[in-house]
């Protein structure tokens, strides 16, 4: 049986304890769910991420390695954390949305995992967010405010509210 290929996109490889714990929680869940999955993480420090978590890793701004990984993957996971907000930076929001858009265009399964969504100040970004998220396969958010925001935005996919993935760590 072929290995199940998974790409994880998030704010990984920057030694942020919360984000690294989120990645660990996602990896634990995936390894319980799939038999020996092949996992690639998009990372700010690929060698450190690969060594620490026992995964493949590609550089955060290496477009060719990212595109190649997304082309070969079965599933793209975007999360967790508060990636889809433009208060910190509208550029980071566009970055994460672009990864999701490529996954959708490549016809991959795309899963938003344990996300905190918003706030989104810019109207054009809200429009893009609505259209992109109406094409993903699954959405889980970590709070009712994020769910309400997406519903008011016009995202018609089923949105599940779940605890922050870090709470599931073994």
Predicted feature descriptions by range:
Residues 1-170:
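Active-site anion-handling motifs in enzyme catalytic cores
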